[in-house]
Design a protein with these regions (language model features):
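Short coil-to-beta-strand transition motifs
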Residues: 134-136, 143-150
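Short beta-strand-centered aromatic/proline hotspots
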Residues: 149-157
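Acidic-enriched and Gly/Ser
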Residues: 1-136, 154, 161-187
Length: 187
């Protein structure tokens, strides 16, 4: 699991072309876990949103950690490193429809997303971007608890007010119910 503290490690002597950003990548044929193993072995920071699901194997029901969205992985590295990765594995950039450039996720947005989505034991809810399209809420920051420092939008999801963190156009994750005394309104 990637923690926000591990993501903050930086190398100040990098060239401009080797600057690391968070890229959203599509991995074809459900090979995201294979790409994750390769990235972990080569010290490339990566994140796959995972959740526990009940599966049946040989008549026994087991709880297994599986990707929430098939074929999606976030990688923090340089463009040249991703091009090397593309030679070994069937991956593609997720492109911004407006500009035609690869989607680059801002650091703060990704750290907030990891803080919520990387917490497998909590009751978080993953949502498709279209599920909250018509709802708008207040921007808030969580002041205390396991999600301390996370910024998102306060929205009613499944009959509870939850803080929703999103990667624009790709995926959203909502925290469990957060008591109003733990919220700081930003707007």
């Amino acid at each position: 699991m990637v923690s926000p503290e591990n993501v903050l490690i930086r190398n100040e002597n990098m060239k401009a072309s080797d600057t690391s950003y968070w890229y959203a990548l599509r991995v074809t044929y459900s090979r995201e876990m294979m790409v994750k193993k390769h990235c972990d072995a080569n010290n490339i920071i990566n994140f796959i949103p995972l959740e526990y699901r009940m599966c049946e194997r040989n008549g026994v029901i087991i709880k297994k950690l599986q990707p929430v969205i098939r074929n999606l992985i976030f990688v923090k590295t340089s463009m040249s490193c991703i091009n090397e990765l593309k030679r070994k594995y069937p991956i593609r950039y997720i492109m911004n429809r407006g500009t035609g450039d690869p989607v680059i996720v801002p650091e703060k947005q990704m750290l907030d997303f990891i803080a919520v989505a990387g917490n497998y034991d909590q009751q978080v809810v993953f949502l498709a971007p279209c599920e909250l399209r018509t709802k708008t809420g207040s921007r808030v920051r969580i002041r205390d608890g396991i999600f301390k420092g996370v910024e998102g939008v306060l929205v009613r999801v499944r009959n509870n007010k939850r803080v929703v963190v999103q990667i624009e156009g790709l995926v959203m994750v909502a925290t469990h119910y957060i008591h109003p005394s733990l919220l700081e309104y930003l707007e």
